[in-house]
Amino acid sequence: MANLRKLGRRTDHRTAMLRNLVQSLFENGKIETTVTRAKEARREAEKMITLGKKGDLSARREALKYIYKKDVVYTLFEEIAPVYADRQGGYTRILKLGPRRGDGTEMCILELVDYTKKESSEEKETVKADK
């Protein structure tokens, strides 16, 4: 089995944290986290995008085993995966930010390459209402 970073957590806590990081990445297009967490989340995100590129029913069910929100899986298969149809891996990028102020841990931004998040009509209405 491939080496896995333990991240100072029990197995169930670690897998839940990585699932949440990947889910947030697909919802927002980018997330800010520590470098070690980003490297682990990147592994899982790349696997999920590869499943999204397959696009069949079994791939969708496999993705639902890892990502619990159906709307995030829909976004993955319908919006994110088609962007990477001609790309053979390297769907994410890690941009280092520098040390965190409290404890000096190296922080970074994990983002999807060549993907711009589409704003829904609800988000546009709230932006207009705020102005």
Curated annotation (Swiss-Prot):
GO terms for molecular function: structural constituent of ribosome. SUPFAM superfamilies: Prokaryotic ribosomal protein L17. GO terms for biological process: translation. This is Large ribosomal subunit protein bL17. InterPro entries: Ribosomal_bL17, Ribosomal_bL17_CS, Ribosomal_bL17_sf. Part of the 50S ribosomal subunit. Contacts protein L32. The gene is rplQ. The lineage of its organism: Bacteria, Bacillati, Bacillota, Tissierellia, Tissierellales. It comes from Finegoldia magna (strain ATCC 29328 / DSM 20472 / WAL 2508). PROSITE patterns: RIBOSOMAL_L17.
